[in-house]
UniProtKB/Swiss-Prot annotation:
Belongs to the FPP/GGPP synthase family. This is Geranylgeranyl diphosphate synthase. InterPro entries: Isoprenoid_synthase_dom_sf, Polyprenyl_synt, Polyprenyl_synt_CS. One of its GO terms (molecular function) is metal ion binding. It comes from the Bacteria. GO terms for cellular component: cytosol.
């Protein structure tokens, strides 16, 4: 991706380099069983399809050997709750709910983008059909809300559901804006970041706010953690776009240059097209050509984005957003876990 993102040492403190990965594994261990029970409670064939999408088993229910996701959003809930003095048990249902919402968006995303592969194997829509994939996404969304209705404190449950549903509305708007950006002759970096604020940052901000909420934090702390998660989500999307162009297909589970082949208006591309360089002119011609991108076109587009500085802009943006995220944290909740999850974004490969 043209270099690894680095953060100012003042923001990092003495956080162990492997803490972030340990937090993801802990989130998987704590949240996974609740997620399994939620999926198994669904009627067939929804349960089988949901477990397939989550990477737990194959279409015939035989054990799958692939990835089952990172549990990054669940880890954000746990870390935010812990930073506010909350209990893991209280945060677990919320963690499961946000993972379900995240996966509902992935199911719909795959349909809208026409992606036939996720995590190295066929997507749900390409196995069972478009209509089924949409309905499964709806079912995961409904199951997430059902989990939150079971929270012990009814007041917290209502506030949590309200926040989650507002973030879902923001997600829909962000996804709609993403659709509008495709094929637009002129898209600015600000246009892109406004879209990413809804498509990605809304949910990561919600995750952190919900963690603080179940820990009974005050409104100011909840707002600060939501801002932290929002900025982190923008950084996550920036890095996601870098991976979409320069990521290793063996790690990402998607074809090389997948975003470029589909002429997606990702941040590196948008930045490159706005560079007013010769490379930008040639890249614009490739993006506006009526014929589908060939493998050589994708290779050339990749080189042009790099020459025009698109990768550098996206890296810098991710770095700035992570620093803004950490700066948003009050000292009382600036925990090693939250810092470690911030660092993890810099080092992610898929």
């Amino acid at each position: 991706m043209g270099g690894v993102l680095t953060l100012d040492a003042a923001f990092l403190g003495s956080v162990p380099a492997d803490l972030g990965k340990a937090l993801l594994e802990r989130a998987r261990a704590d949240c996974g069983p609740v997620l399994h029970r939620a999926i198994e409670s669904m009627r067939e064939p929804l349960a089988t399809m949901a477990g397939y999408h989550l990477g737990w088993w194959n279409a015939d229910r035989s054990t799958a050997a692939g990835s089952s996701g990172k549990y990054f959003r669940a880890a954000l809930v746990y870390a935010a709750a812990a930073a506010c003095g909350g209990d893991v048990g209280d945060a677990t249902p919320v963690s499961a709910a946000v993972e379900l919402v995240h996966n509902f968006t992935l199911l719909h995303d795959d349909v809208m983008d026409g992606d036939a592969t996720r995590r190295g194997r066929p997507t749900v829509w390409s196995v069972w059909g478009v209509g089924v994939a949409i309905l499964l996404g709806d079912a995961l969304h409904a199951t997430a809300v059902r989990i939150l209705t079971g929270l012990t404190d009814e007041c917290v449950a209502v506030r949590a559901i309200r926040r989650l549903q507002m973030s879902c509305l923001d997600l829909c708007i962000g996804q709609f804006e993403d659709c509008l950006l495709e094929g637009q002759p002129e898209v600015t970096v600000d246009d892109y970041l406004r879209m990413a604020a809804g498509k990605t940052a809304a949910l990561t901000g919600c995750c952190c706010a919900l963690g603080a909420l179940v820990a009974n934090a005050d409104d100011a702390t909840i707002a600060a953690l939501e801002r932290f998660g929002h900025e982190l989500g923008l950084a996550f999307q920036c890095v996601d776009d870098l991976i979409g162009i320069w990521g290793d297909p063996g790690v990402t589970g998607k074809p090389v240059g997948n975003d470029l082949a589909r002429r997606k208006a990702t941040l590196p591309v948008v930045a490159a097209l706005n560079s007013r360089s010769e490379a930008a002119t040639e890249l614009a011609a490739l993006y506006q050509a009526p014929a589908a991108m060939t493998a050589s076109d994708v290779e050339r587009a990749t080189a042009l984005v790099k020459v025009a500085g698109g990768g550098h802009v996206a890296q810098r943006c991710a770095d700035e957003r992570i620093q803004a995220a950490i700066a948003a944290l009050p000292d009382a909740v600036r925990s090693p876990d939250l810092i470690a999850l911030s660092q993890l974004i810099c080092r992610r490969e898929c």
